[in-house]
């Protein structure tokens, strides 16, 4: 989307030299909002899966089995839960919408809260498991924090929830052996 018709024409002319797919003509405001919408939608979908994992943990239900069964319905496609949301797009872009439209973006705002909380929750789970191990075995556990990046095959740790989890675990470890592994 360009600032006006002429700039849109120039952009399409430029990108059509190397883009194989369809180039869609729109204005710059809609184009920007489209990118924010794509990333916010993903954030909301991830938050739903993460919220289910929190509920299932308290209810004693295997979240993986639950999602697998629910996804057998033809109109259901629940994502897999994780330790939050990372990266410079999905974890950040929703804030552009919520800052400009706070009253209208309740679901987007809540999704950010859920996904941010999930990293805190995971850190607490690891800390509690470490404490339990130490009490039962009278020695400090050896911990491997594996996969700090927010997705496979990248070296980008921006907004990675695993980075937060690792920091919190290291702060509470009292000299436990912690190995940080990024394959």
Report each predicted region and the residues it spans.
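Structural/interface elements that position substrates and couple domains in central-metabolism enzymes
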Residues: 1-183
